[in-house]
Amino acid sequence: MIVTGNPVCAIALLLCLVFRASGEYELEMSSGGSNDGRSPSNDFGSCTDGKCTKRTTTTQESGISSGMWFGPRLGKRHKSNEKQQINPEIEMLVNALDQPGMRWTVITIPANEKRQPTQFTPRLGRGSEEKFIYSDATDRNEIDEDDPLFTPRLGRRVPWIPSPRLGRQSRSVSRKI
């Protein structure tokens, strides 16, 4: 459904949105001041000496209020200049292994592995390396027994086992057997 309205209101709304959005992106070129090595386009005075203030406040010089950023977080959130401390025992071991003329094979073993690798077993009670041997079968019919080529007809089972659905007939048949 298309709603028609006053074109003057639509143009005024469009101009208001355009000027509101472009106002936050104006750059302020500062003359002097403390930039702390930052570029002049990024000087909003939000962080000085590692202490940051909220960026939603209006700066008094420019009158620009910085908006909230809903995009992805940019930059690293952790200090990258921290030195990794090496355990002195490991450092001593590395120095011993690093001596010239000595050949070592280093194998790394993971310390905390949560999942253990499982061994595939094709049949219960048999390992994957074992082969099926004919003498393992308890009955010779296990080996030679094949599935019938056609499905059996209803009611014809070859050793006949009475079904519980037959009710009284199953009791009389079981007495005869």
Curated annotation (Swiss-Prot):
Ranges annotated as biased composition (Polar residues): 31-45
UniProt xrefs under PROSITE patterns: PYROKININ
Keyword list, A-Z: Amidation, Cleavage on pair of basic residues, Neuropeptide, Secreted, Signal
BP-aspect Gene Ontology terms: neuropeptide signaling pathway
Tissues where the protein occurs: Pyrokinins (PK) 1 to 4 are expressed in the retrocerebral complex. PK 1 is expressed in central brain, anntennal lobes and abominal ganglia. PK 2 is expressed in optical lobes and in gnathal, thoracic and abdominal ganglia. PK 3 is expressed in optical lobes and in thoracic and abdominal ganglia (at protein level).
Domain of life, per lineage: Eukaryota
Protein name in the entry: PBAN-type neuropeptides
Naturally occurring in which organism (per UniProt): Camponotus floridanus
